Each structure stands twice: as structure tokens, then as C-alpha cells.
Amino acid sequence: MKGQQKTAETEEGTVQIQEGAVATGEDPTSVAIASIQSAATFPDPNVKYVFRTENGGQVMYRVIQVSEGQLDGQTEGTGAISGYPATQSMTQAVIQGAFTSDDAVDTEGTAAETHYTYFPSTAVGDGAGGTTSGSTAAVVTTQGSEALLGQATPPGTGQFFVMMSPQEVLQGGSQRSIAPRTHPYSPKSEAPRTTRDEKRRAQHNEVERRRRDKINNWIVQLSKIIPDCSMESTKSGQSKGGILSKACDYIQELRQSNHRLSEELQGLDQLQLDNDVLRQQVEDLKNKNLLLRAQLRHHGLEVVIKNDSN
């Protein structure tokens, strides 16, 4: 959006020129410019030209060339505005605190605002940012030769500063070259993120499918192991919960059987010990019987063993 220049007659008789409705590339909202004045801007000391931003932000400006001739269709007394070449570098000097409290223009801003004055590099001495050489001023007219805005520059240079967005084009003049953005805006692409999410979702679904298949296989194996489930027909539609319930009952029965068998095994061990003791006693008695028979033969006695079964 290009700035609109306005002239207003104040009570003291001085003419105050303001630029308003300026939008930068970063801030789309319009800002008012009103608080900068150059000591050598106008030939007339009563005319004050100031710039100021309402929110105290940075103001972008462009350098264009002003020719002294007239174009076809222009009114008399109006200068022609042409685009300044983009390839030609224009170094500008920035002077801070160009005003004093005596000659400053009253604005709505606070007293703590920082004021800047822009001078071309050709008009600034080496190493000094606040002094200008005495030279003629190149001016551009917008309403007529009466409202001339100038900047202390050598003759023929014809540059001045326009507070506007780089993408906007001045109306009423020839086309000018606009420098492209140094960092073009590129919207973030959501395609990689969508592809990554779909791939992650597919992997998750594959893992879940494998887990369900394993669980189903284990349940089928349980149904084959449990006697009650194996006897039932597959057409009955035995549920997984029913198979698991019968598996739990079968496991409980197996545990009880194992406990009962362990108790019986302990009883068998005890009987085995008792049997060993009795066997040892029988062997001892047999040995004593043989000794007694031997003694009886030694004394001439015949031992007759009678069978009770006869």
C-alpha cells in the first residue's frame, strides 16, 4: 500500500506534511508515519517533514529516482517519478537524534521515541554521520511545485525515501524494479507428515494383527488340550471366553490331583521304609534259626520240621 501525503496548515502558520496508511511486508496493519525531520530537508525553515510509527516498530523504505523532466500526460509543475535501478546499491546514513526540543514538531508520540534522519551517502562525510555538505536538494512533487519534498543530495541523483511495502507499486508513475524477498515464504507441506503417519498406522495395524493371530492360535491349542473342549463340535461356536474358563477349571483339577498324588507318594515312601525295616528283621531271625539248628546237631538231636499244612 503506498503512503498518502497530506498537508495541513497549523495555527503557527507552518506546514506539516505527514505520510499515513503505510503497511510493511511483515505487518499487514496500517501504521501512521509522522516523526522524523531533517534539518536540510526544505528550503523553507517553516516547513517540517517528520516520520513516526504508532507502535514504535521498524519502517521499511525504498529508494526511487526523481527526474526533472515531465512525462506525457503530466500536469505542469509535477516531477516524474521513475524506478531506481535495483542493481545500483544506495548506501544511506542514519542519524539518530536529529532534533532538539526547540525545533521538533509536536506529535502524539511519547518523549522517549527515537528519531532518525536519512541522508544519502554522497552527502555525508567520511566517519561523521551527522554533518552534510552544502549542495542543492533534489525534490519530488506530489501536488504541485508548492509542496516540494527534498533531500540534501548532489544534482542529478534524485533519490528520496518512500515508506511502503516492497511488493506495492507507486501509482501515477512509470514502473520501477522491486527487489524480491531475501527469504521467500514457503508454506509447510503436510504430505511427508501424512505419509509418515500412514506408514506408522500400517505398522501398528500389522503388529496388532500378528498379536491377535498368536492369541487365537494359543486358544485353539488350549481347546485341543482340554478334554471337554475337544469333545465338543466346532459348529457349536465355542467362544474364546468359554475355552479360557474351561482351561482354568482344568488347571485347578490338575493342581488338586497333583496335590493328592504328592500326599500318596509320601505315604508310599513311608511304607517303603517300614518294609525295609521288616525285611531286615526277617533276615536277622533267619540267621538266629540257623544257629540254633547247628547247636542241636552238635548235641545229637535231630530237628524235625513239621508242615502244618499236612
UniProtKB/Swiss-Prot annotation:
Residue(s) of cross-link: Glycyl lysine isopeptide (Lys-Gly) (interchain with G-Cter in SUMO2): 306
Extract the InterPro entries matched here: bHLH_dom, HLH_DNA-bd_sf, USF
Q: Does the keyword Transcription apply?
A: yes
Q: What are the subcellular locations of this protein?
A: Nucleus
- Sorted UniProt keywords: DNA-binding, Isopeptide bond, Nucleus, Transcription, Transcription regulation, Ubl conjugation
List, in alphabetical order, the GO biological process terms annotated in this UniProt record.
carbon catabolite regulation of transcription; cellular response to glucose stimulus; cellular response to insulin stimulus; glucose homeostasis; glucose mediated signaling pathway; glucose metabolic process; late viral transcription; lipid homeostasis
Q: Where is the composition biased (Polar residues)?
A: 1-17
- Residue ranges with Basic and acidic residues bias: 190-209
CDD domains given in the database record: bHLHzip_USF1
The bHLH domain extends over: 199-254
The segments labelled Leucine-zipper in the record are 271-292
Provide any one GO MF term from the record: protein-containing complex binding
Segments of this protein annotated with the region Disordered: 1-26, 171-209
| Subcellular location, principal | nucleus
Q: Which disease is it linked to?
A: Hyperlipidemia, familial combined, 1: A disorder characterized by a variable pattern of elevated levels of serum total cholesterol, triglycerides or both. It is observed in a percentage of individuals with premature coronary heart disease.
What does the annotation say about its assembly with partners? Answer: Efficient DNA binding requires dimerization with another bHLH protein. Binds DNA as a homodimer or a heterodimer (USF1/USF2). Interacts with varicella-zoster virus IE62 protein.
Role summary: Transcription factor that binds to a symmetrical DNA sequence (E-boxes) (5'-CACGTG-3') that is found in a variety of viral and cellular promoters.
Supply the name of the protein: Upstream stimulatory factor 1
